[in-house]
Amino acid sequence: MADSNPHPNEDSLELVDGSRVAVIGGGPAGSFTSYFLLEMAERADLEIEVEIYEPRDFSCVAPGGCNMCGGIISETLVQNLAAEGINLPDTVVQRGIESYVLHMDVGTVRIETPIDEKRIAAVYRGAGPRDIQVRKWGSFDHHLEGLAVARGAKVTRGRVTEISMDNGRPSIAVKGGEPQAYDLLVAAFGVNSPALKLFKELDFGYEPPETTKTFIREYFM
């Protein structure tokens, strides 16, 4: 029986034909990683497998389809993506924002953008609020995930519940599923993800970053 591990050297950090990559997190970080990794592999004439693990379906309305994060990005990012051939539709990029307003107990402060040309863009992270009647926009996260899939990535709708090492290779499993071994594991989840605990339990010195609690609220307009 042929060895399923494409690497004859367990200590190799180089991806080769047949290498398998797991990306935990299907938000922008995970989708961008998958998209550009597959693009670079194509340029290098490598055939690799990329699998994104994401429990949320970003095409769904209500909290179940939202990453629970504010949809604010720099327009520089939008322009850089366009230079890479990735054009975000108007249904995803809602509008440009000229300033922030900081409300405090001692008063209100308006924070203008430092350079007029470098505006801030608002995007929709989910597909819409729970009681939406007509969908007028698309999800930023769903759009990016779709680009990664079009590049060749596979999406598994499930929450990773186990991470271990199998003969020097990372192995992960979702609830009710069999462990899957990979050659590279990418952690592309947020600081609130329970996957942080799984990495800490691997006992290789990882410590979750310090965080500050933030309350984020969206208003339907």
Regions found by a protein language model. Give the residues of each.
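Beta1/beta-strand and adjacent pyrophosphate-binding region of the FAD-binding site
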Residues: 11-29, 51-53
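Conserved Rossmann-like nucleotide-cofactor binding loop
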Residues: 29, 58, 192
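Predominantly flavin-linked oxidoreductase catalytic cores and closely associated redox partners
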Residues: 36-39, 146-221
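Glycine-rich FAD pyrophosphate-binding loop
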Residues: 38-66
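N-terminal FAD cofactor-binding segment of flavoenzymes
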Residues: 57-108
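Short beta-strand to alpha-helix junction loop
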Residues: 69-72, 117-146, 194
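N-terminal Rossmann-like dinucleotide/flavin-binding domain of flavoprotein oxidoreductases
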Residues: 76-83, 91, 138-154
